[in-house]
């Protein structure tokens, strides 16, 4: 069985942001992001499942706990995945010890590897003084009560080790997009994770007319706790109002009231012909 510790970092320009997909759900989301593209970030997969790593197009990969799981996955056991991540802690540190200033850790909570390993990776990143943002999903109801309970425990654990945590409730997506098929439901979850990571990362990596940089993002997110974010789009007449209304009704908000937020960061994208 081949061991995977593959750090093929691009050499064209330094990238201070990493997006790490942990486990099956996180890996699917990062595969999707990699294909869609996010400007100037490095994508990474961490998994106990050697086969899933081999099948991914993402070039930077780390197999967790090779002696514990022997590349066969965590068997839906978060405690086994935690042990695997701890065994690979030095490799995780090496992965991050290259000038990384911000890391997004994305995982589907409720299974084994994402639920167990993501909090360990988050803890290591935070201990290295890297701005650490968790973006995780809670399962659909049809995935079963055990998985949901396991997911909530995982959310509680990762919340202790991140600067900011975005929790996306998959069941909320199903309520909003009621016509989704079984497979499209998981695809919509991947889309939502991708939008969340892309929206924050490209505030830093894409220069704007009124520029926001890493320091601005760090001020908002550092030790921010549970966070919510949203995106909205508008076109034609009253497009600004339409975009705001769209953002306020995004599934990313999970019915949360944004008006009690302690910090807010607003980023607006517009065409050159837009009037003030």
Predicted feature descriptions by range:
Residues 1-276:
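Tubulin/FtsZ superfamily GTPase core signature
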């Amino acid at each position: 069985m081949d061991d995977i510790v593959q750090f093929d970092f691009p050499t064209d320009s330094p990238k201070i942001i990493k997006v790490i997909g942990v486990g099956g759900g996180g890996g699917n989301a990062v595969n999707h992001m990699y294909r869609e593209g996010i400007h100037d970030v490095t994508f990474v997969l961490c998994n106990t499942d050697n086969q899933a790593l081999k099948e991914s197009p993402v070039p930077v990969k780390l197999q967790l706990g090779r002696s514990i799981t022997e590349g066969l996955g965590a068997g839906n056991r978060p405690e086994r995945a935690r042990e695997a991540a701890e065994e690979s802690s030095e490799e995780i540190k090496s992965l991050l010890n290259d000038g990384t200033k911000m890391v997004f850790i994305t995982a589907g909570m409720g299974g084994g590897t994402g639920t167990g390993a993501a909090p360990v990776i988050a803890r290591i990143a935070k201990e290295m003084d890297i701005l650490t943002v968790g973006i995780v999903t809670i399962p659909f109801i049809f995935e079963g009560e055990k998985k949901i309970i396991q997911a909530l425990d995982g959310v509680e654990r990762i919340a202790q080790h991140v600067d900011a945590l975005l929790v996306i409730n998959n069941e909320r997506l199903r309520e909003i997009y009621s016509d989704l098929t079984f497979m499209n439901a998981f695809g919509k979850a991947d889309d939502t994770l991708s939008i969340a990571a892309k929206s924050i990362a490209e505030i830093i990596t894409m220069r704007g007319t009124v520029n926001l940089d890493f320091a601005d993002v760090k001020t908002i997110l550092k030790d921010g706790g549970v966070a919510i974010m949203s995106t909205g789009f508008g076109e034609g007449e009253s497009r600004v109002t339409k975009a705001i209304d769209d953002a306020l009704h995004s599934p990313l908000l999970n019915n949360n009231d944004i008006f009690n937020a302690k910090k807010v960061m607003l980023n607006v994208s517009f065409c050159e012909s837009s009037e003030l």
